[in-house]
Design a protein with these regions (language model features):
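Long, structured stretches of catalytic cores involved in phosphate-ester chemistry, encompassing
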Residues: 1-106
Length: 106
């Protein structure tokens, strides 16, 4: 897909039952048109209707993943603007997955 958003979520079986089977991190692009915003207008409604989603963000940026034997950490790096020079880079969220668990723990 072509979402131009940041997402993190837990994936479940097709029927939606049981424990999560995997974790997915989705990154936006850093240079697509429009600077985005922290949340889209309907983000709260989308999150409420999709409890498997643990994070959503509409800013431009990229992911940095720190992978160690017992922990995977994903840092959502975002810029406050891309439509003109001088955008400030920051870490919007850091989410982790522990070894042997298919769930986001932080």
């Amino acid at each position: 897909g072509d979402e131009h958003q940041n997402f993190a979520g837990e994936l479940r079986r097709w029927d939606g039952g049981g424990d999560p089977v995997a974790v997915e991190f989705v990154a936006t692009s850093i240079s697509s048109g429009g600077s985005g915003q922290d949340k889209r207008a309907n983000a709260d409604r989308i999150m409420a209707r999709n409890p498997e989603l643990k994070f959503s963000n509409d800013q431009r940026g990229y992911l940095v993943c720190d992978v160690a034997p017992d922990l995977w950490q994903t840092h959502f790096r975002v810029v406050d603007k891309v439509h003109e020079p001088g955008g400030q880079l920051s870490t919007r969220a850091t989410l982790s997955v522990e070894r042997g668990k298919a769930a986001i723990v932080s």
